Amino acid sequence: MIITLEYVVSAFDQTAVIEDLDRVLQTRAGRRLEYLSIAWTSLEAIIGVGVGIVAGSVALIAFGADSIIEVASSCVLLWWLAEGSMDRDRVAHRLVGGCFFALGVYITADASMDLLKGEAPRATYFGIIYAAVCVIVMPVLARAKRRVAAQLNSQALHADSHQSDICAYLSLILLLGLALNAVLDWWWSDPVAALCMLPIIIREGIAGLRGETCSHAHF
């Protein structure tokens, strides 16, 4: 069978079209993930701050404030996904790194205030359920972001997935803190555990501000 030059060129054109279509679909998947992330973390912020005020829990209020940073991070990623340029990817990656750093500031302020006041929040079983749901949802969202980030070769989306990982760890700390406070009256358990996470968060923030990849990080 004779393969003509026209046939070969046509095959290459079809391959290029398929690759372009795949990237469009992957970018749309990334946008959907970020819309979902914005919706979920906005709900986290409302519930966390609201329940925290009612229960007098600084940890819950801080966790809600963390969700605001998550929303900002997702908005940054939507900005990059709008065009997908490498320049935007680098800028977005640094902005996400700044969000990590801001997250560390929030946790430091929260934990220090809690330890200085020495006042335990009231037991809140709704808060415990809320934290447990976050522990389940955030790792699933982070894995989905990493999968799409690998397909798009986006460092910014990959960094954002690590921010979702950190949110999952914070929700686990929150869950343990609320549970220990409710069961054993250990008011100090939440701020001490939160401070233990600061080295990881600060390292990721510095890496992001330098424009370095976060793919080396392990949690």
Segments and roles (model prediction):
Residues 2-219:
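Alpha-helical transmembrane cores and adjacent cytosolic helix/loop segments
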